[in-house]
């Protein structure tokens, strides 16, 4: 049995996926499996992923019959995982070599169910932009207005994910939606060690902003059952803190 299952949902990131996979394969900690969930049935990138998987029994490649989105693809990967711990990595992000060894050791030493770490923000070419430090703890009330948890820094015990606690079908904010649910029952503990690199991609500002606003409102109104007024209030706080964290140096 492997100690860690690394879940990577894949959707049209052919420029970066090899770097992401290599950053896992080059870990000092070796007792892991990689589960790549290919979420674009019409795209030919699957053949490229097969080549990357070739002759490597650490990699499992799953192909969705239809596009499920990143959240549901992660749920599928988790369900197939055979490890005690689950780690998440997006297909354009990377890890530092000591990531798994250091973070798993931290979790075992402190008997933790969930941890996240500090990370570097990098641009599309890999140039460092800034470092985002992990707070000691992310409580429910903190998360409502400012999420400091980088998805590709998270490791949690598989037992935490079930029918009640899993990723939603939101196109964005699906990770925050899960963190909020988990924070009501578990401690989400930060490890102030820089172990990951999060790639800040250039995207259509108008389309991405609209989607994030819609999903943010759905998060509070539909999933957290807030009133319209309360949902708008927290959406404003979350958006302000996101802009402050990601666009102000």
Q: Model features per residue range: what roles?
A:
Residues 2-5, 23, 33, 177:
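Cell-envelope/extracellular polymer assembly enzymes that use nucleotide-activated donors
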Residues 10-26:
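Short, well-formed alpha-helical segments that are part of the catalytic scaffolds
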Residues 21-63:
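Acidic donor-binding segment of Leloir-type glycosyltransferases
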Residues 64-81, 102:
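Glycine-rich, basic loop-to-helix element that forms the pyrophosphate-binding segment
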Residues 86:
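Short aromatic/hydrophobic "clamp" motif used to bind/position activated sugar donors
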Residues 90-94, 118:
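The conserved acidic donor/metal-binding loop of glycosyltransferases
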Residues 98-129:
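Conserved donor NDP-sugar-binding/catalytic core segment of glycosyltransferases
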Residues 131, 135-211, 219:
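Conserved nucleotide-sugar donor-binding catalytic segment
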């Amino acid at each position: 049995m492997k100690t860690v299952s690394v879940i990577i949902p894949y959707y049209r990131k052919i420029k970066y996926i090899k770097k992401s996979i290599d950053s896992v394969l080059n870990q000092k900690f070796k007792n892991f499996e990689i589960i790549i969930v290919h979420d674009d049935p019409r795209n030919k990138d699957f053949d490229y992923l097969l080549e990357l998987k070739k002759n490597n029994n650490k990699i499992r490649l799953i192909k969705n019959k239809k596009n499920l989105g990143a959240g549901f693809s992660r749920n599928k990967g988790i369900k197939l995982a055979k490890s005690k711990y689950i780690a998440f990595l997006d297909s354009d992000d990377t890890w530092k070599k000591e990531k798994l060894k250091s973070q798993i050791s931290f979790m075992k030493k402190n008997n933790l169910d969930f941890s996240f770490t500090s990370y570097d923000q990098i641009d599309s070419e890999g140039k460092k932009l800034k470092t985002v430090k992990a707070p000691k703890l992310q409580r429910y009330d903190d998360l409502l207005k400012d999420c400091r948890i980088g998805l590709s820094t998270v490791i949690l015990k598989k037992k935490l994910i079930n029918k009640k606690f899993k990723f939603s079908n939101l196109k964005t904010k699906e990770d925050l939606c899960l963190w909020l649910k988990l924070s009501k029952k578990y401690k989400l503990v930060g490890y102030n060690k820089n172990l990951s690199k999060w790639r800040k991609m250039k995207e259509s500002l108008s389309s991405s902003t609209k989607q994030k606003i819609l999903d943010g409102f759905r998060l509070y109104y539909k999933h957290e059952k807030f009133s319209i007024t309360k949902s708008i209030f927290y959406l404003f706080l979350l958006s302000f803190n996101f802009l402050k964290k990601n666009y102000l140096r």
